[in-house]
UniProtKB/Swiss-Prot annotation:
Cell compartment(s), UniProt: Cell membrane
Subunit details: Homopentamer.
Known role: Channel that opens in response to stretch forces in the membrane lipid bilayer. May participate in the regulation of osmotic pressure changes within the cell.
Name this protein carries in UniProt: Large-conductance mechanosensitive channel
Primary gene name: mscL
Family: Belongs to the MscL family.
Membrane topology, as annotated: Multi-pass membrane protein
Cross-referenced InterPro entries: Mechanosensitive_channel_CS (IPR019823), MS_channel (IPR001185), MSC/AndL (IPR037673), MscL_channel (IPR036019)
Species this chain originates from: Geobacillus sp. (strain WCH70)
Length: 131
């Protein structure tokens, strides 16, 4: 059982996924800091000095922190857009390289027989022209 798990865990896809999750988590922290520490204070300044993180409604003992929700939504959209742009660039590079490979692959490669047949055809044309 342990051997099977080890083989599964060391497969390329699982390791790649783990690296992606770790990098994604770090990227999320960077974007969260960008939103919380740079963008939201500027947006709050433009809207008259509003600090979104402190916005809330109180219903008795319950507190609804809708300001934090607004920050989280902005955070989500920035992360989503960043990932979208990153994937779009990667796909463009991937498909550009793929098209170049296809062009190389579609270049006609003649077999030995085809080359010989073309030589025979050319020789027959020359013989006809000389008569």
């Amino acid at each position: 059982m342990w051997k099977e798990f080890k083989e599964f865990a060391m497969r390329g896809n699982v390791v790649d996924l783990a690296v992606g999750v770790i990098i994604g988590g770090a990227f999320g922290k960077i974007v969260s800091s960008l939103v919380n520490d740079i963008l939201m204070p500027l947006v709050g300044l433009l809207l008259g000095g509003v600090d979104f993180s402190g916005l809330s409604w109180k219903f008795g003992k319950a507190v609804v922190k809708y300001g934090m929700f607004i920050q989280t939504v902005v955070d989500f959209f920035i992360i989503s857009f960043s990932i979208f742009v990153f994937v779009k660039v990667l796909n463009k590079l991937y498909w550009h390289n793929k098209k170049e490979e296809e062009i190389k692959d579609t270049a006609p490669t003649l077999t030995k027989e085809e080359e010989l047949l073309m030589e025979i055809r050319d020789l027959l044309k020359q013989q006809r022209e000389t008569r």
